[in-house]
Amino acid sequence: MSQKELWYETLHANFGQYFSVENVLYREKTEHQDLVIFENPELGRVMALDGVVQTTERDEFIYHEMMTHVPLLAHGQAKKVLIIGGGDGAMLREVSRHKNIEQITMVEIDAGVVEFCRQYLPNHSAGAYDDPRFKLVIDDGVNFVNQTTEKFDVIISDCTDPIGPGESLFTSVFYEGCARSLNEGGIFVAQNGVCFLQQDEAVNSHNKLSHYFSDVSFYQAAIPTYYGGIMTFAWATQNPALRQLDLATLQNRFAQAGLACRYYNPAIHVGSFALPQYLLDALTTIPKVIGVDSSE
C-alpha cells in the first residue's frame, strides 16, 4: 500500500493536526498569502492559508451560518451588510439568503482568493457572487472602514488568525472604524479563534472593543475542523437588548426569513451566548486601560 501524502497544520507550535491529501487542486503563493486547496476523503475540499486550515466542504456550514444568521436575525431589520474578508464566498452565500437585505459589500484584500475559490470551491459561494445586491471591493479592511462614508447595519469580520495579513483586523484602529461605520443599532461580529487554546485573542478583543461599543460579548459554535473544537465569535453593539432576545422572537424572525439551516436554529442562537466559566473569569479580570493606542 502506497503511503499517503500528509499535510500538517502549523498554527500551534507544540501540538496540532494533519490531513491526508488525495489530490492537490491548487497551490500558489500570492503577494499576501500562501494558498493551497486539496482534497481529503472525509472533509472534501480543504483550503489553507499560510499553513492554517481556513475552511472545508464538510463543516463550513456551521461557521458561516453562525457568523451570519446570529447577527442578522438579532438585528431583525438589516438592509446593508459589510463583510470583511470572506473571499471563499460562503459568508456571502448565507447573507444573500436574507431577502430583506438590499446591499451586500465585501472587502477582500486578495483578489486571488476570490478567483481561485470561485473555481475550486464553487459550493461555498453557490452562485452568490452573481447576486445583484453584491459589490466586491479589493482593499485592506482597516483602510476601508476608516475611509468609507457608508454606514452598515451589520459588519461581519471573516478574518484569519491574528498573524500575517489578518493581524490588522484585531487592532483598535480597525474596531474603531467598524464602530464608526455602523448605523444606530448596528452589530459587529468577528471570528475570535478557539478560546480554549487562544484565550488571549478573546481577552484582547474584548479589551479593545469595549472602548467603542457599550455591549461586548462572545458566542460560540462547535466546528470540528478548527483544532480545539469550540470556535468563539466576538459580538459588539451599542444595544445590549439585541444579545438577549427571547426564543419566541427569534423563532418568529427565523420563520419569516424562510431559512432552512443545517446547524443554526433559534435555540442554538440563544444557547450560543452561554460562555464557559474559564472565559467569563478571564474577561472579568481584564485590567482597565486608560487611553487607546490605535496602533495596537
Swiss-Prot record:
S-methyl-5'-thioadenosine binds at residues 33, 108, 140-141, 165. It is an enzyme of class 2 (transferase). PROSITE patterns: PABS_1, PABS_2. GO terms for cellular component: cytosol. Spermidine binds at residues 64, 88, 158-161. GO terms for biological process: spermidine biosynthetic process. It comes from the Bacteria. Its main location: cytoplasm. Pathway: Amine and polyamine biosynthesis; spermidine biosynthesis; spermidine from putrescine: step 1/1. It catalyses: S-adenosyl 3-(methylsulfanyl)propylamine + putrescine = S-methyl-5'-thioadenosine + spermidine + H(+). GO terms for molecular function: spermidine synthase activity. Belongs to the spermidine/spermine synthase family. Homodimer or homotetramer. Catalyzes the irreversible transfer of a propylamine group from the amino donor S-adenosylmethioninamine (decarboxy-AdoMet) to putrescine (1,4-diaminobutane) to yield spermidine. This is Polyamine aminopropyltransferase. It comes from Yersinia pseudotuberculosis serotype O:1b (strain IP 31758). The gene is speE.
